Amino acid sequence: MKAETHIWEKISLLKIILQLITVIFLFGTHSITAQTKKSESEKLKKEYHTGAYRNLFLEAGYGQTEIDKKVEKAYLDLFEGPNRIYFEVGDSMAYVSDIKNHDARTEGLSYGMMIAVQFNKKEVFDRIWRWSKKYLQHQEGPRKGYFAWSIDPKTLKKNSEGSASDGELYYITSLLFASNRWGNNTGIDYYAEARNILDEMWKKDGTGNIYNLINTDAKQISFVPEGNGYKWTDPSYHLPAFYEIWAEYAKDGHEQFYKDCADTSRVFLHRACHPVTGLNADYTDFSGKPHPTPWMPEGFRYDSWRVPMNITLDYVWYGRDKTWQEDYAKRFQGFLRSKGIDSFEDQFNLDGSTPETILQAGGFKKLRHSLGLLATSSSTSLIGKNEKSLDFVNALWNAKLEPYQDGYFDPYYDGLLYLFSLMHLSGKYQIITPQHK
């Protein structure tokens, strides 16, 4: 009996040892897997959040002091100079105005906030946000959380109650950056304001004919989140880089959806841009096919100027579609270069021919060599390393924000695109990561 008992004791001990080995093995495997996933995640973040942004002006031979002065002058011209587009109201508010159209619109207001947070201009940012929230953001009803897209800043009468989806896109991203840069305990809870827009966006289900800013079936931004405008899009509203920012910093439980939207936007741009010229239509269906309207015939016009800059932004910040984006930049710059780098005009049919219908701007209905398009096309010189593209960089360096020979002058749209592009090419347009615990 003693021998039998001794044998069973050995067997029981062996079982316990085997169980311990299994537990140790499983725990080790889990730890290695978790560590691997963590390493991959950190590697991805480090790859695009290193803080290293190319200064293409410096690479082109311009001095850093000259570069800083040029960027600062462009900022001061828009925000403080005699032709400024930024106007302070009382002690705590301000607005950005599209001078030629005699209004303030969410496009320019949210651009102003993005510029302010990039340059660490907290007071400017706060003033524009307070004005936007007070006079444009809907605080109740089906549109709650959204913004009226246009208002007369003198009479404060809204030109429309409806939203233009790109305004909200920039407001949200700018607020998240402000939260990262300044924290949320300095008078405005930037994170809460960004989340409010997003949370209200997710409540929109068609009640009152108002929808999500993003068509949730197509996973693409809508032209307007209302009625039929929810069913098509504007290529210049496609900012995949911004969705990546939302996925990382909004923390609203929709991270995967935003990542999907970023990927969908990238693929959409492949379809929307002409295979030879790189040109896109101002408005398209979600397929990328042009979507002409009674007020906007098919063609590459003012809205579309922003597309090359948006593609540059995605390339510089995240670089997840490099092969196509590098090919796009060569095609797009190559087409404009073929028209004359100092003379290419600003509206085209997608095949590069001259359109029959010319869109008017500021009372002028004519084609011109516009600073805005020169600026955004120059920003694409950051895509890849093509020495030939430095001709655009030099052309932008030598350009000036001033009236054209016929008297037309647009410090608002030309000016903002010019400033954004100077920021890009000097390495000053960056992802703002959290700087406060």
Predicted features along the sequence, with ranges:
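Solenoid-repeat scaffolds in large eukaryotic assemblies
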Residues: G112, V124-F125, G187, A194, ...
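Solenoid-like repeat scaffolds
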Residues: W397-D406
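Helix-capping and short linker residues that terminate individual alpha-solenoid repeat units
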Residues: Q137, G183, W202, G206-T207, ...
